[in-house]
């Protein structure tokens, strides 16, 4: 009876805390903290894609519930250890994982983080309720025969293998050096079964990717630069050519003042027989967001003959609007989003006539979002 009463009182306290604030602080003292929080995200989607089979309109719903467990323990000299786990329960019935990492360091100083996480965002896209790109590729997955919208995130993180990062703050200056370890063949669609410029990927071994970032805050302005590259030769090979020999560069700037936030981004990838340049700008004013991204893919026939020669460009517009605190419920939002994207094939020569199709895709989404 006493245990039942204690559990009932604890449950009532937790419910009261959840009602008052987003997230629950189970422990919050000078020696450390532990909290449970999360969010719910459900999307109702419409898409009209020429790249889709039969060119049919698509209607679907997707989403997930994220639960976050986070804790830190402090020492009297300012050092700390921390852990975070974010399991995802998808509306499809699958269970996935966002972040899962351990970190230690000195508050407002240096830190070492290991596990699964995302490093510094070198291509922030603002309020991107719905953002996709023409073709069969994504901005973090290379698919042969499709244009690639490179965004300086091949070594950013949340991969299936190991990851570690060192970061430090020096006043307005922030520096981080991240590394991803292990099999990175999943960067290419199909992995070991996939292709690159028409050639079969035939051998794979573990990669070692590094990604240093330097950022500086100047009043309302922030600027950051990065580079990412693989240090292991012949980590991914197609027809005797080391296609893991890839080096990318990123530059991003942000201006935030009052209700305005503006991002400008540039990313460039130097890869085998192709170069990928992407530029983007987006703005957020109050709850309205608007953005544009343009990708230029230059192909040549040096290592692989007769695949493609010339340029393929991708242009993408997107817009979003957020209704906050719907029904006067704190942290409950309804978001509207739309995008339009197109491919412009300017190749002088290509071996596969079905590749790099000039397709126009568009979509619209209503998102229900609640943070708890």
Please name every model-derived segment.
Residues 1-24:
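Gram-negative bacterial Sec-dependent N-terminal signal peptides
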Residues 50-53, 141, 184-205, 230-246, ...:
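Solvent-exposed loop segments that connect transmembrane elements
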Residues 24-45, 56-184, 215-219:
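Outer membrane beta-barrel
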Residues 78-81, 108-112, 172-177, 220-225, ...:
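Repeated loop/turn-to-beta-strand initiation elements of outer-membrane beta-barrel proteins
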């Amino acid at each position: 009876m006493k245990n039942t009463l204690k559990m009932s009182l604890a449950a009532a306290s937790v419910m009261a805390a959840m009602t008052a604030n987003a997230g629950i602080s189970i422990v919050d003292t000078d020696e450390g903290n532990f909290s449970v929080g999360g969010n719910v995200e459900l999307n109702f989607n419409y898409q009209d894609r020429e790249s889709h089979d039969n060119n049919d309109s698509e209607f679907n719903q997707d989403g997930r519930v994220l639960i976050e467990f986070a804790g830190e323990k402090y020492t009297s000299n300012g050092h700390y250890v921390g852990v975070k786990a974010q399991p995802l329960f998808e509306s499809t019935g699958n269970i996935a994982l966002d972040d899962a990492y351990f970190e230690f360091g000195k508050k407002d100083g240096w830190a070492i983080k290991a596990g699964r996480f995302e490093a510094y965002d070198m291509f922030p896209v603002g309020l991107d309720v719905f953002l996709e790109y023409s073709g069969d590729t994504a901005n973090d997955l290379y698919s042969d025969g499709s244009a690639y919208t490179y965004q300086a995130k091949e070594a950013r993180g949340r991969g299936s293998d190991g990851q570690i990062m060192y970061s430090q703050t020096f006043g307005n200056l922030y520096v981080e050096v991240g590394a991803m370890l292990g099999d990175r063949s999943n960067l290419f669609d199909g992995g070991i079964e996939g292709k690159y410029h028409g050639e079969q990927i035939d051998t794979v071994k573990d990669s070692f990717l590094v990604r240093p970032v330097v950022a500086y805050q100047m009043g309302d302005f922030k600027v950051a630069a990065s580079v990412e590259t693989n240090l292991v030769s012949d980590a991914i090979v197609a027809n005797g050519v080391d296609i893991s020999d890839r080096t990318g560069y990123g530059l991003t700037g942000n201006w935030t003042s009052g209700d305005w936030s503006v991002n400008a981004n540039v990313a460039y990838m130097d890869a085998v027989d192709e170069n990928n340049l992407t530029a983007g700008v987006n703005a957020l004013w109050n709850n309205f967001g608007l953005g544009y991204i343009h990708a230029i893919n230059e192909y040549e026939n040096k290592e692989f003959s007769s695949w493609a020669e010339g340029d393929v460009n991708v242009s993408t517009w997107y817009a979003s609007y957020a209704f906050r605190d719907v029904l006067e419920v704190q942290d409950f939002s309804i978001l509207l989003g739309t995008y339009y994207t197109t491919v412009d094939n300017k190749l002088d020569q290509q071996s596969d006539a079905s590749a790099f199709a000039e397709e126009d895709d568009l979509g619209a989404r209503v998102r229900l979002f609640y943070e708890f």
